[in-house]
A protein has these predicted regions:
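Conserved N-terminal segment of class I S-adenosyl-L-methionine
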Residues: 1-89, 95-97, 191, 210, ...
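Short glycine-centered segments of the SAM/dcSAM-binding site in methyltransferase folds
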Residues: 37, 122-124
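Glycine-rich, phosphate-binding/catalytic loops in enzymes
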Residues: 54-58, 78, 113-118, 142-145
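A short SAM/SAH-binding and catalytic strip from SAM-dependent methyltransferases
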Residues: 95-106
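S-adenosyl-L-methionine-dependent methyltransferase catalytic module, highlighting the catalytic core
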Residues: 106-114, 124-237
Length: 238
């Protein structure tokens, strides 16, 4: 780990674990107001402190098929439910966000229809997900979930927090198209490459990841090969 720490210090001195969630948190905070009612779509057990917005809005609700959501400490209410059938009334939320959820959806169009339904007019949807043209999702699609669980355990992540992936709304084009089909208005899609987390276990792979990050970050026409996709859409005001 000594050489890896040295590479961390030299190339990514300002990075820390879950740097992508720090970026997403900042994006969410720019869209949350003090009196907002917010839905964390795919809230899970509450293992990511960056997704705690209790001090910045009125209430945060959460849904997830994982029953641990009911004990998520960041939520006013956590409900075991799927995104295809959100258990809340029409026009209920000011903001809906999904952190590392979109890649797991087998029917993203259905989920976005539900997002549209529960958002108030003018409400905002934000999603953070891997870009499917990056090498990590490409490898993921060629390997079974059992491999993902094993590799994530090597990285220090619990197997129960690794889920099957579909990558059906994981590029800029798909995000724009599926949002429009659900009557949501796409506002922006950011594509970002950062510290290569999945390659940091070994020096040789880490060096490759650093070179890749430098290239795709500096050449704009390679932006579609960056790892992180953050999409923002809005429910039109009637």
């Amino acid at each position: 780990m000594g050489l890896i720490k040295l590479l961390d210090t030299k190339f990514y001195p300002d990075y820390k674990n879950n740097w992508d969630d720090d970026i997403f948190r900042d994006k969410i905070l720019k869209n949350i107001r003090k009196n907002d009612v917010v839905l964390d779509l795919g809230a899970g057990a509450g293992i990511i402190p960056q997704m705690d917005f209790r001090k910045f809005c009125d209430r945060v609700y959460g849904i997830d098929p994982d029953p641990r959501v009911e004990n998520n400490p960041y939520l006013f209410e956590g409900v075991e439910a799927f995104g295809e059938d959100v258990p809340y009334p029409d026009n209920f939320f000011d903001v809906v966000f999904a952190d590392n959820v979109l890649e797991h959806l087998s029917a993203p169009e259905t989920v976005l229809n539900e997002v549209y339904r529960v958002l108030k007019p003018g409400g905002i949807f934000l999603g953070k997900t891997p870009n499917k043209f990056h090498y990590m999702p490409l490898i993921s699609r060629l390997t079974p979930t059992s491999f993902h669980k094993w590799y994530n355990q090597l990285r220090g992540r619990d197997a129960e927090d690794t889920f099957p992936t579909c990558y059906l709304i994981n590029c800029s084009k798909d995000f724009h198209q599926l949002c429009k089909e659900s009557s949501l208005l796409p506002i922006e899609v950011d594509l970002i490459e950062g510290r290569p987390e999945y390659l940091r276990m070994f020096v040789l792979t880490y060096v490759f990841g650093i070179l890749y990050q430098r290239i795709v970050s500096s050449v704009n026409f390679l932006r579609n090969f960056r790892i992180l996709l953050i999409g923002v859409a809005q429910k039109p005001i009637d």
